[in-house]
Amino acid sequence: MTRTIAIGDIHGCLTALDALLAAIEPKKSDILVPVGDYIDRGPDSKGVIERLMELREKTQLFPLMGNHEEMMLSVLDRRREPFGWLNHGGHNTMESYGFAGDLSVIPVSHREFLESLLPYYESPTHIIVHANYDSQMRLENQSADLLRWVKISHQMPKPHFSGKHAVMGHTHHPEGQIVQLPHLTCIDTYCYGGKWLTALELETQRVWQSTPEGEVREFMLEPVPSPAS
């Protein structure tokens, strides 16, 4: 049976990602949807990108673009001065590449991977975005700014008109908790801050979580009842 598994914001935490993948044991038939923000803040952004590139050969990978990948690409393309990105964790990414003042230390294959990242993923039952969405608009018509930048703590979206359940990251919970509402689930559980990296199997609501040190736990996510009409 095909599993669809969303993975929350990794932020350079390669040990946590490897522990999570060892627990999940992804198969060729599985669909993995990392929600974006693979880089910055944590210690090994380079290693995370390499691991995701390897996963493309082992499973069906649909990686989304987060705001941190957008910032990095805009610096690489000379469309943005580097200071904003560096101050939001970009310096950690550059350190993982052994940066010595020359952006060419980033391999072309890594840049091509970043350029290939998707704006969203949609299945018959779910929509997966990095940050947020407009509840009345089809995903292909949504702005990149909303999909990648707007925290649900600043603008909580209503249920999507399609009736599909939304899954996202970007807005981390300071205590590392999964945020659940009847119409959405946020799986940014603050791994780089010492909490958890979360993976969620959409079909069963099975959850895998790992700490930055690689300790893993599993549990089933209890459904949130819809408010009585």
Predicted regions mapped to residue ranges:
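N-terminal active-site segment of His-dependent metallophosphoesterases
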Residues: 1-51
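Active-site environment of divalent metal-dependent phosphoester hydrolases
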Residues: 11-15, 40-43, 69-73, 135-136, ...
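Active-site neighborhood of divalent metal-dependent phosphoester bond hydrolases
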Residues: 41-122, 149-157
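Divalent metal-coordination and catalytic microenvironments
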Residues: 9, 37, 52, 66-67, ...
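His/acidic metal-ligating clusters that form di-metal
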Residues: 106-176
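Acidic, His/Gly-rich catalytic cores of divalent-metal-dependent hydrolytic chemistry
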Residues: 147, 152, 158-229
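Active-site neighborhood of phospho(di)ester-bond hydrolases with catalytic His/Asp-centered motifs
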Residues: 7-8, 32-36, 63-66, 165-171, ...
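Active-site-proximal beta-strand elements of phosphoester/diester hydrolases
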Residues: 4-11, 126-132, 185-187
